[in-house]
Structure formats: C-alpha cells, structure tokens
Design a protein with these regions (language model features):
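Alpha-helical metal-binding/catalytic segments enriched in His/Glu/Asp
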Residues: 164, 218-220, 233-277, 308
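Short amphipathic alpha-helical segment within the helicase RecA-like ATPase core
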Residues: 1-217, 221-224
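Glycine/charged-rich beta-loop-alpha catalytic/anionic-binding loops adjacent to active sites
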Residues: 51-60, 142-146, 185, 216-219, ...
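Short acidic, glycine/serine/threonine-rich loops at helix termini
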Residues: 98-103, 187-190, 230-234, 280-286
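A glycine- and small/hydrophobic-rich beta-loop-beta segment
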Residues: 263-270, 274-338
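Fold-independent oxyanion-binding glycine-rich loops
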Residues: 21-23, 59-60, 178-181, 207-209, ...
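Short, conserved micro-motifs enriched in small and acidic residues
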Residues: 66-71, 154-155, 240-251, 302, ...
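Buried hydrophobic packing segments
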Residues: 76, 252-260, 312-319
Length: 338
C-alpha cells in the first residue's frame, strides 16, 4: 500500500488525509478534540463516503514541540490502519510539521515478520525522504524494536553483542566486549551469579564516545537478561515466552548509542550493558546464596527471580567507577519479585 506526504503552500495550520478504503460506507464524525496527558493537541473530523475517507486535522496552536507533531502522525496511522486505507495522501502547510508527522507515522508503521512467508517491515511504502537526523532517529527506534522482537535462541548475550557492534558507527564510538574470564577478574560477581545456570556465557558491553574526557556527562546503563525463567525460583510457564523481553533495558541503551554514534554531540557519554540468562540448572544460583558484589557488599539471595537488581548493582557501580559520570540513566524491566 502506498503513502504520499506533501507540503502545500497554505497559510492555515492544518493537515488533511485523503485515502481509498476497501468498504463502501458513509460516516461523518464532526470535530472532536484529541488530548494527550490532558493537553489539547488538535481537533479532527472524519468523513467517509463510498470508498473515500477524508480526515481533517486543525491544530489548536502552532506546535513547537516535535513530540506533539509525531502524535499527529501516529494518529493518522491509526486511522489509516483502522479503515484499511489502501492509498493515502497527507497534505500540510508546514514542512517541519510534515517531517515530524511522517516520523510519527513511520514509527507506528513497523512490522517484524521475518520468520513468516512474505515477510514485510511496514504496511505502507512511501518515497518521502526524512531528514538525516529524523532518519537516524527512526533507524535507531526500529533497531530497538528488532532486538526485542527476536526470540531468545537468536538473541542471547554473545549474539546480542555481535549484532549491536555491527550496527554502531565505530568511527565515533569505542566498544569494549568483556567476556566471562574478564568479568570474573574484574569482580562482577552478582552478574556472574545470575548467569550461573545458563549454558550461554555472560557478556558486558561498554561504549564510550571517542576521545571523551575523563568524567563523562552521561552514562547509560541497561539490564540485559536475554531470557529470564526466574531461575530456581522459576516463573509460571504461562507467559514465560515474553521473558525474552527482559533484555529491553540493554536494547534501549544500545539503540541510544547507535543514534549518538551517527550525530555530533556537545556532551560526552558512555554506556554499559550486562548480558546474561537466568536459567534453572544444577549450577544455578539458589535462594540463600550469599554473593560479594563488585562494591564489596555481601548480598543474600532470597528469590532468584529478583535478578535484575543484581545485574544492575554491579554494572552501575563498575560503570560509575570507570567513567565517573555526572548523570546516570538506567533502563531495566523490573517486575515480579520487586
């Protein structure tokens, strides 16, 4: 299906969607207010006649916030998808609004179906070229979605590190990959304990802006439990397939580093992710175990499904010691036993 985005020379701040739909019907929705977090963003009206749909969006004020513009694109995608629009034309009077509308639309238009016949990455095809910065944003967001969509037999600590390394611009970012022996030598014992039950070896990835000053401005930290069974304190089987997502924090960190590696920044940054699997086996760590953390604090394990804080405790402490950041931003999926 095709999507066409146009900037037209009009003085009013409005956006119009014209689309062909498969069903013949007649519907009219008078102007309603679209709100986000209780803020009024825009007014919209929908008219459907025969096999044509027309969506009119009137901005309540000129949107200076690009996020609000992206909300419009997301909304247009939802309407197009709801009515199975086969060919759409989107027209607006403002090139900047159009750019961010397209970005919001494209962020929604993502399908990960590589394991299916006739797989595709999106529903709509468009010739519209995003600016370099917005294209980089979209690619980084989609990279994140791809990482978390993969099953755990495809994305595990080592394969995660290989995939991420290939996707980061190493002319501007240095990457270190620490394997089990190095992790053990450093003393990231809590992270090692979580991975004890897995046949896969743990990995710690470090990223840093080339030629960064000693004390970085921002350190990004990500929890990367590539599969979380709960360990000896095993989770219920229902829904356990979703535990491939427990590396979401590491995926977010990697996608941010990917984005930053392709732009010029006026701040220094570093990133660190701890990649493990939390599996039950004869070698797994157990409730009642006592582990000495990287900081030297003894930690008693009461529930092996509370593994995320153990991984984070070690990599945050280690990352802060190495990079001495002014700000730490950590990303983690922490649920269940917390």
């Amino acid at each position: 299906m095709k999507a066409q985005f146009n900037s037209i020379n009009k003085s009013n701040q409005s956006i119009k969607l014209l689309a062909n739909i498969s069903n013949k019907s007649s519907t009219k929705i008078n102007f309603q207010i679209y709100r986000y977090n209780n803020n009024e963003i825009f007014k919209y009206a929908i008219s459907i006649k025969d096999s044509k749909i027309e969506l009119n969006i009137n901005l309540l004020k000129l949107l200076k916030n690009s996020f609000s513009n992206k909300l419009i694109g997301s909304f247009i995608y939802d309407i197009s998808n709801k009515y199975s629009a086969s060919q759409i034309d989107i027209n607006t009077s403002n090139k900047n609004i159009l750019e961010n509308t397209v970005l919001g639309f494209s962020q929604k238009d993502f399908i990960y179906s590589i394991y299916k016949k006739n797989s595709q990455k999106s529903i709509y095809q468009t010739k519209f070229k995003l600016s370099k910065i917005n294209s980089n944003t979209l690619q980084s967001i989609n990279f994140l979605k791809e990482l978390v969509s993969e099953p755990s037999n495809i994305i595990y600590p080592e394969s995660f590190s290989v995939t991420v390394k290939k996707n980061i611009n190493q002319s501007s970012v240095d990457i270190k990959i620490l394997k089990k022996d190095k992790i053990k030598k450093i003393g990231l014992n809590c992270l090692l304990a979580v991975n004890q039950g897995s046949a896969k070896e743990p990995i710690v990835m470090e990223f840093s802006k080339k030629n960064h000053k000693k004390n970085v401005d921002i350190l990004f930290v990500g929890k990367g439990v590539c599969f979380d069974s709960g360990g000896i304190s095993i989770k219920p089987s229902a829904g356990m397939e979703d535990m491939k997502w427990d590396m979401g924090g590491a995926a977010v960190t990697a996608s941010i580093i990917k984005y930053l590696s392709n732009i010029k920044t006026n701040f220094s940054f570093a990133g660190i992710v701890g990649l493990v699997e939390n599996m039950p086996s004869s070698t797994a760590y157990k409730p009642g175990d006592i582990i000495k953390s990287y900081k030297g604090i003894n930690v008693e394990v009461l529930n092996t499904d509370a593994e995320g804080r153990l991984v984070l405790a070690d990599i945050i402490t280690y990352g802060c010691e190495v990079y001495k950041p002014k700000v730490v931003i950590d990303f983690a999926t922490l649920t269940g036993a917390i």
